[in-house]
């Protein structure tokens, strides 16, 4: 699929070699084929072709970020924002750079900017919530998780993570409720049973705690047996279901994002904080 796409872009570029997006798309195709050298060359050519297009800088910055070349990534995201001060994805990506280089307050400021420009972006709320949790700002983290639950109600991780914040704040019953919500969405979620069991001990519910421990142990044993099972493919549906539960409705709004190229509208660039 991507090799055919590269052939098509080659033909187009032979006829029209002044279209930056063609080089960006060809670079993305190489990136999907794990050819980072040619991807980088194409992003460079896109930038030389149109130095005012933020997409070229953002794509090259994304490649630098992927390769943990944070200084170069930051410079590219800065340039993209200089080209278009409302280019959300570069604020988002620069926040990832700031987080990776231990600058949480600057990362928060960039996530704030993304949300200011796109107030329903659940993945940005989720990342900001995790960052706020890391710095101990639990109440604001809860507010962000509430937004994620509003915009992506079937995302299992929001309930799991929010439960941890409630537990930190001593709101044990609400934490149990969230672990229960996570389990309803994904009944094989062993960790959710483990943590709910511990909290049930605190709530003087030894029977419930024992049941959760037992279920967790069974789920873990089942998972391990699947890993060793030659018919593992029969369990693929469960894995795919979990992947779907982790998905976010994270389509960015705004004019700049309408220009993003890529096989799913740019979603593949957005990522969770590590």
Outline where the language-model segments fall.
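Alpha-helical tetratricopeptide repeat
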Residues: 1-274
């Amino acid at each position: 699929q991507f090799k055919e796409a590269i052939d098509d872009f080659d033909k187009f570029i032979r006829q029209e070699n002044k279209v930056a997006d063609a080089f960006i798309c060809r670079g993305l195709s190489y990136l999907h084929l794990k050819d980072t050298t040619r991807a980088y060359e194409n992003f460079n050519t896109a930038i030389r072709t149109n130095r005012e297009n933020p997409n070229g800088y953002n794509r090259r910055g994304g490649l630098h970020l992927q390769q943990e070349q944070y200084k170069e990534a930051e410079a590219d995201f800065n340039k993209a924002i200089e080209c278009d001060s409302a280019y959300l994805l570069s604020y988002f990506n620069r926040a990832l750079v700031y987080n990776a280089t231990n600058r949480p307050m600057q990362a928060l400021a960039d996530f704030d900017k993304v949300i200011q420009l796109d107030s329903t972006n659940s993945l940005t709320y989720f990342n900001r919530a995790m960052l706020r949790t890391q710095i101990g700002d639990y109440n604001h983290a809860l507010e962000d998780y509430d937004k994620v639950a509003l915009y992506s109600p079937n995302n299992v991780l929001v309930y799991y993570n929010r439960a941890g914040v409630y537990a930190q704040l001593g709101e044990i019953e609400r934490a149990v409720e969230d672990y229960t919500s996570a389990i309803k969405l994904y009944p094989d979620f062993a960790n959710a049973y483990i943590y709910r069991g511990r909290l049930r001990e605190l709530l003087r519910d030894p029977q419930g705690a024992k049941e959760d421990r037992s279920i967790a142990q069974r789920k873990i044993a089942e998972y391990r047996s699947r890993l060793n099972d030659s018919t593992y493919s029969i369990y693929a549906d469960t894995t795919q279901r979990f992947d779907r539960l982790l998905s976010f409705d994270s389509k960015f709004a705004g004019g700049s994002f309408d220009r993003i190229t890529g096989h799913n509208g740019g979603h593949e660039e957005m990522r969770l904080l590590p």
